[in-house]
Amino acid sequence: MFETAIAAITAREILDSRGRPTVEAEVELECGAIGLAQVPSGASTGSFEAHELRDGDAQRYGGKGVLKAVQNIQEQIKPHLLGSDALKQELIDRKMIGLDGSANKASLGANAILAVSLATAKAGAEALGLPLYRYLGGPLANLLPVPLMNVINGGAHADNNVDFQEFMIVPHGASSFREALRWGAEVFAALSKVLHDKGLLTGVGDEGGFAPNLPSNQAALDLLMTAIAKAGFKPGEEISLALDVAASEFYQDGQYSYDGAAHSPSELIDYLATLSEQYPIVSIEDGLQEDDWQHWQQLTSKIGHRVQLVGDDLFVTNPIRLDKGIKERAGNAILIKLNQIGSLTETLQTIDLATRNRYRSIISHRSGETEDTTIADLAVATRAGQIKTGSLCRSERVAKYNRLLRIEDELGAQAIYAGTIGMGPG
């Protein structure tokens, strides 16, 4: 038996950062190397995401349990993978996808497949004595991502009256990731004081950002501009802004409801264009509903030459959806969430498709996270140039930032911060 053969697979139900169950898998190889992976879960999910298998038993966790997914790993996936070479990642992922047999991993569950997929990769890296970013990315894995830091939460991520889901700061002007992280932390601290002085709540949402009640989306942007200046930075030059509109969340019957009124798609496009002129906004995610291809084209035509337009619900890390977007010129960037597609192999293929077509990739967390730091390594491995992993508090968010600090230290003089070369390829 060769040393990198899979000798054991175990799985268990654990809790994510919202106190909801999720799947953890452990893969052990013949050489003794072990890979451990935990799967995140989203709050605002795209309709076209791979299927997250939940138990539906109202007597446990309100039906959110994942014992079925755990059982599928133990009883179906494990027998098919024992003895397989962990270094043959694509073969292992294809085995699980074939075993599932459905179009969206509804049989075994994307959460079951992804947990084993990631644990296998980590075990393979451990067996070779390599950090995960080097194992996945090879010798060119040296680009540290610009963080898009979600410091004001709204929409489905917070219990407040703010329509847009995320208001982010982007410290692209820093000279290193370590400096970018410090800048973000200092703005976050300044924002806390600004909110406090205005008598606004400083409680945080799912992703660690503040979640105050505000009269408009524009009011949130004004707060960020004030905080950036208060922290001693130049808005637009050193630190810019980014939005996750999550427009599907407030779309109904062809209308978008925000700022207290219903608006047409054309009105929303004009609104986003105006905001991007009035504020130093470098990125807008999910500016329109996930299946409104026609208006996505219009938005891209109108401001895509100067603003990064990111498809999250639009593309759901799916190469088929991304290919359609490329052909129809909808958006110019894709958000990458491992659990939207459900395997490491398919995630890497989607990133490759984006890169070949000059679409930027932003590696992303989910609102329900764990202490797993895979996405930090993935961002460096793929040279994506950007990462979304929340605010500057809550340890499930900070864990990813701290992992990137360690990677930057490991790389030493080889490390390049993506902000110095324009936030990655595209």
From Swiss-Prot:
GO terms for cellular component: cell surface; extracellular region; phosphopyruvate hydratase complex. One of its GO terms (molecular function) is magnesium ion binding. Keywords: Cytoplasm, Glycolysis, Lyase, Magnesium, Metal-binding, Secreted. It is found in: Cytoplasm; Secreted; Cell surface. (2R)-2-phosphoglycerate binds at residues 165, 337, 366-367, 388. The keyword Metal-binding applies. Pathway: Carbohydrate degradation; glycolysis; pyruvate from D-glyceraldehyde 3-phosphate: step 4/5. Mg(2+) binds at residues 244, 285, 312. Binds a second Mg(2+) ion via substrate during catalysis. Its main location: cytoplasm. It catalyses: (2R)-2-phosphoglycerate = phosphoenolpyruvate + H2O. It is an enzyme of class 4 (lyase). InterPro entries: Enolase, Enolase-like_C_sf, Enolase-like_N, Enolase_C, Enolase_CS, Enolase_N. The keyword Cytoplasm applies. One of its GO terms (biological process) is glycolytic process. The active site is at 207 (proton donor), 337 (proton acceptor). Belongs to the enolase family. Catalyzes the reversible conversion of 2-phosphoglycerate (2-PG) into phosphoenolpyruvate (PEP). It is essential for the degradation of carbohydrates via glycolysis. PANTHER family: ENOLASE. This is Enolase. It comes from Cyanothece sp. (strain PCC 7425 / ATCC 29141). The lineage of its organism: Bacteria, Bacillati, Cyanobacteriota, Cyanophyceae, Gomontiellales. The gene is eno.
